[in-house]
Design a protein with these regions (language model features):
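Short, acidic/polar
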Residues: 27-39, 82-97, 139-149, 196-201
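Beta/alpha (TIM)-barrel catalytic core signal, keyed to glycine-rich beta->alpha loops juxtaposed to Asp/Glu
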Residues: 108-251
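Acidic-and-aromatic substrate-binding clefts and catalytic sites of carbohydrate-active enzymes
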Residues: 24-28, 48-58, 78-85, 111-114, ...
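Alpha-helix-loop-beta-strand connector modules within alpha/beta enzyme cores
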Residues: 58-76, 121-130
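N-terminal binding-site loop/beta-alpha segment at the start of enzyme catalytic domains
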Residues: 1-71
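Conserved, mostly hydrophobic/aromatic
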Residues: 6, 18, 47, 60, ...
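Active-site groove signature of glycoside hydrolases
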Residues: 93-113
Length: 251
């Protein structure tokens, strides 16, 4: 497993990120634990969840019991007032069975709801109290992500990035790298529409600062991701042709 620094933070994260939003939907606690521990045993150390998925947070907290300090744990919260971040954080800390979050992300798709400087000020207070180590931003909106990068207050941004949303978001990848800001790619399979895992992975691995966040649902999916992470496809003319075929199909 390869590891990269998440921007200018001191967080070294696995190149395979584990998106745990669906963990609460797995049929048993035992199967959820088996999935998380298979990823961990393969070297995955970056686990991402959300305050909005309380059952999944609780499951993840239980699964990481005993190994929590060996992983980079990220969660996020959507608020209308920066002062509400701490309440959401406290909920997540309880659910995740931990006393700190490595990466706490402000989540928004609405422009100008809360000013970034207000978010940053509150996040800094949470850092001073030892509740978080770093803070980032999660959004599905290109303009919000661009503004966040321009503000330089966040350690990372998380936004959908995949074969089908390449051209516009690619500029953000470059800007993040230039600003030494971590870039987490959510929806690498475009919410399941792209079924070719090696193609999706090979595309993202062309960008050395990008950490794909895979929404893992079962052992079979995880096994494929881990296999192609260890054996990435060759980016050649055939690879490019297959990417263009997928884009043409969805255009």
């Amino acid at each position: 497993m390869d590891y990269i620094s998440l921007g200018k933070s001191n967080l070294m994260v696995s190149r395979v990120g584990f998106g745990a939003m669906s963990l609460g939907e797995i049929d048993t606690d035992e199967n959820a634990s088996a999935l998380v521990h298979k990823a961990y045993d393969a070297g995955v150390n970056f686990f991402d969840i959300s305050h909005s998925a309380q059952e999944s947070e609780k499951r993840l907290g239980a699964c990481l019991y005993g190994i929590r300090h060996n992983v980079v744990l990220a969660t996020k919260a959507c608020v209308l007032d920066a002062r509400d971040l701490e309440e959401c954080l406290d909920d997540s800390l309880s659910a995740l069975r931990t006393d700190y979050i490595d990466l706490f992300q402000y989540e928004t798709d609405e422009k100008n709801i809360v000013a970034f400087d207000e978010i940053a000020a509150q996040m800094e207070r949470l850092k001073e109290r030892g509740k978080i180590r770093h803070f980032g931003l999660t959004t599905e909106d290109f303009e919000i992500a661009a503004s966040a990068l321009d503000s330089s207050v966040f350690a990372s941004i998380q936004i959908p990035f995949n074969i089908l949303v390449m051209k516009q978001v690619e500029s953000l990848v470059k800007k993040a790298q230039e600003g030494d800001i971590g870039f987490v790619a959510m929806k690498p399979l475009y919410g399941g529409l792209v079924r070719n895992i090696p193609l999706a992975l090979g595309f993202l691995y062309q960008y050395e600062n990008v950490v794909p966040l895979w929404g893992v649902r079962n052992i079979e999916e995880l096994s494929q991701i881990l296999y192609f992470n260890a054996h990435p496809p060759l980016v050649d003319e055939q690879f490019e042709s297959e990417m263009e075929n997928i884009r043409a199909f969805f255009s």
